């Protein structure tokens, strides 16, 4: 029996961060549509090797495979920007650039979760979920 997290996205990011620091290449997290979308965007951006959903009796699980430590696509920092107690929103023109464009910001827009570059191209603002580089 697991405790319910007040911020499931922060929990997912912490699981990924802890796995990287521990030298693990696989992370398991309880399934939700938002967590799956965030993980898929990180995979699409090249920060994760694979994202799968494992069907389970009590609950489905997201299985995330992380790149080998030392590759240039390794996550150096992954930080939650918008939190339940302090939501952070930005217009398309105000979305921050991370490490001069080498990192990404995930943005939750009306068209779904996308990277900062995709949001700027689509001229969509939204809630800033996290920054990764």
Region locations from a protein language model:
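Core subunits and conserved enzymes of cellular information-processing
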Residues: 1-133
């Amino acid at each position: 029996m697991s405790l319910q997290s007040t911020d499931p996205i922060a929990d997912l990011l912490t699981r990924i961060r802890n796995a990287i620091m521990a030298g693990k290449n696989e992370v398991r997290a309880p399934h939700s549509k938002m967590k799956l979308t965030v993980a898929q965007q990180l995979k699409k951006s090249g920060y994760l090797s694979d994202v799968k959903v494992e069907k389970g009796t009590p609950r489905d699980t997201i299985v995330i495979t992380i790149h080998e430590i030392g590759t240039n696509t390794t996550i150096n920092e992954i930080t939650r920007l918008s939190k339940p107690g302090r939501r952070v929103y930005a217009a398309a023109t105000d979305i921050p650039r991370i490490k001069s464009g080498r990192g990404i910001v995930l943005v939750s827009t009306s068209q779904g979760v996308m990277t900062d570059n995709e949001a700027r191209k689509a001229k969509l603002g939204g809630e800033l979920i996290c920054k990764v580089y």
